[in-house]
Structure formats: structure tokens, C-alpha cells
């Protein structure tokens, strides 16, 4: 029997999301973006995550950290959003795709196009399981992953924020009163 090549174990890399540092150390004297990044490094984080921050790439290089860029995207906006995110030189891009009422078949169609554009830009993208998006329930997420694999032969790259499944089918006003 042929020997299998050893599989490298996964590495856990922790990142601080900038939104967790808003209003710090106080709402009266909030940290600058640089201070937030430096604080994350000081606390032992490997990376920082947030939206399209122009200075992200420079700050991460200076602090020997990586950046995870968050974007929301829809059928008409995904190309522009990916191009803007590319400027942050992210290790990966976390995508919150479409809306809660987007059908899985529609989500897969746009996701396939997004992956193609991301690859041409040299980007790695992950679809985040998130409230008020096409992945807001486990059933929809499973359906999207299944359809993506059927269409491409590849597994869907997912980013799980486990807290969001606790909030499934979150509807914002005026739909929920």
C-alpha cells in the first residue's frame, strides 16, 4: 500500500475585528486606526479585519500582521467591491452576499462570477454565513454549497460566524415589528 503524504495540520490564526475596538478606550477619546491595529498586535492577534480601509495594507506590513477585508456584495456591485478590497492587500476577503430573500440558485450564479473575478485579481474570497444575507439559515447555506459544488466541482469556501446562526431569519424593520 502506498504511503500517504503527511497532511499539515491547520493553523489557528486569530484576528481582531476593528468594530470591536470602536469607542475604545472611551467614546470621548477614541483610538485612531493605527492605534487600533497596534493594540490588536499587542494583544497577540495575528490579523485585523474590517472593511475597505485605505491604510490597512501599510499598517499590517508595518506590524507584521495580515488583513481580512469584509465586503457586502450584490449582483451589480460585486466587481467594484472586489476591486476596492484588492487595494487593502488582504489575506482573504470575507463576503456577505446579497439579501435574506435571495434564492440559493441566484446566489450561486453570482458567487461563481465573483470567484472568477477574484481569481483574476489574485484574491481569495470566502462566503460568510451572516444574518440578512443569502446564507442566513443553515438550510440556505447548505443548498448554496451543494449547488456550487454541482456547478463547479469545487467545495464552497465558507466563513462561519457561529453567532449568526443563533439569529436565523433576522428581519429588520419594517418587516419585523
Language-model features: where?
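N-terminal pre-domain/capping segments
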Residues: 1-90
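Proline-centered loop/turn at the N-terminus of a beta-strand
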Residues: 13, 66, 92, 124, ...
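Active-site beta-loop-alpha junctions enriched in small/polar residues
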Residues: 17-24, 51-53, 70-74, 97-100, ...
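Charged helix-capping and loop-helix junction motifs
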Residues: 29-32, 104-112, 138-143, 171-176
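Hydrophobic residues within beta-strands of alpha/beta enzymes
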Residues: 48-49, 93-95, 125
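Alpha-helix-loop-beta-strand connector modules within alpha/beta enzyme cores
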Residues: 56-75, 112-122, 146-151
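Active-site gating/metal-coordination segments in enzymes
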Residues: 81-107
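Acidic/histidine-rich catalytic cores of soluble enzymes
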Residues: 120-177
